């Protein structure tokens, strides 16, 4: 695990974005941890979040021309990541995002920001069922662009209804890499380093053994 990944876990814990306990997910599955990226909700939070996303992008080595943030959660992520890439990595790249409803006046259309073209890096918080990715792919393909990859904050590394995860389904269906700032394995590694979190480690390990991919 790299330093920025460890720092991201501590950032998420500090902001209570990442919590341990017993949580019932939308699927009905009981999880020993919960991740709610919506709690990154101040200016400083967003500035830091953008730096972690930018670090993961640079670390991945994936080549891309533009950042795309699917409405709604992906919008601030794309914006802050673009700023962080320019300020901290000297990479001044365009970004855009979609509207849920297309405008019929003013600039019109369903996109805001740069023209959607070239190799597109999609940024979002998490992938649960992959629905937002599929909707975004329709937009990307309609503009003649290609998907270079997808970056999310946390890869839960668990299977959904089938034997593979929603992330693996996206990789299979669109032939792209899905990368993340951290994975469930990183979280387990972090817990292993913290004796005071031993009770959570046992629960997360058990969950991984039952549902992990």
UniProtKB/Swiss-Prot annotation:
The keyword Magnesium applies. 5-phospho-alpha-D-ribose 1-diphosphate binds at residues 26, 72-73, 99-100, 103, 105, 124-132. Keywords: Glycosyltransferase, Magnesium, Pyrimidine biosynthesis, Transferase. GO terms for molecular function: magnesium ion binding; orotate phosphoribosyltransferase activity. Its EC number is 2.4.2.10. It is an enzyme of class 2 (transferase). Orotate binds at residues 34-35, 128, 156. One of its GO terms (biological process) is 'de novo' UMP biosynthetic process. PROSITE patterns: PUR_PYR_PR_TRANSFER. It catalyses: orotidine 5'-phosphate + diphosphate = orotate + 5-phospho-alpha-D-ribose 1-diphosphate. It holds the Pfam family Pribosyltran. GO terms for cellular component: cytoplasm. Its cofactor is Mg(2+). Disulfide bonds: none annotated. Pathway: Pyrimidine metabolism; UMP biosynthesis via de novo pathway; UMP from orotate: step 1/2. Catalyzes the transfer of a ribosyl phosphate group from 5-phosphoribose 1-diphosphate to orotate, leading to the formation of orotidine monophosphate (OMP). Homodimer. Belongs to the purine/pyrimidine phosphoribosyltransferase family. PyrE subfamily. This is Orotate phosphoribosyltransferase. It comes from Salmonella arizonae (strain ATCC BAA-731 / CDC346-86 / RSK2980). The lineage of its organism: Bacteria, Pseudomonadati, Pseudomonadota, Gammaproteobacteria, Enterobacterales. The gene is pyrE.
């Amino acid at each position: 695990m790299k330093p920025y990944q460890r720092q991201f876990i501590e950032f998420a814990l500090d902001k209570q974005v990442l919590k341990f306990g017993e949580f019932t997910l939308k699927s009905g599955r009981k999880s020993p941890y919960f991740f709610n990226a919506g709690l990154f909700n101040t200016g400083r939070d967003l500035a830091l979040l953008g730096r972690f996303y930018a670090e993961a992008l640079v670390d991945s080595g994936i080549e891309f021309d533009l950042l795309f943030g699917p409405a709604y959660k992906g919008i601030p992520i794309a914006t802050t990541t673009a700023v962080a890439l320019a300020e901290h990595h000297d990479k001044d790249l365009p970004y855009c995002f979609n509207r849920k409803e297309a405008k019929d006046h003013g600039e019109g259309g369903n996109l805001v920001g740069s023209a959607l073209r070239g190799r597109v890096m999609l940024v979002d918080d998490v992938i649960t069922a992959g629905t937002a990715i599929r909707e975004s792919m329709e937009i990307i393909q309609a503009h003649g662009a290609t998907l270079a990859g997808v970056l999310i904050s946390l890869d839960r590394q668990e299977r959904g209804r089938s034997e593979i995860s929603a992330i693996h389904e996206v990789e299979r269906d669109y032939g792209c890499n899905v990368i993340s700032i951290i994975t469930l394995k990183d979280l387990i590694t972090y817990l292993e380093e913290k004796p005071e979190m031993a009770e959570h480690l046992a629960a997360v390990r058990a969950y991984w053994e039952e549902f992990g991919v």
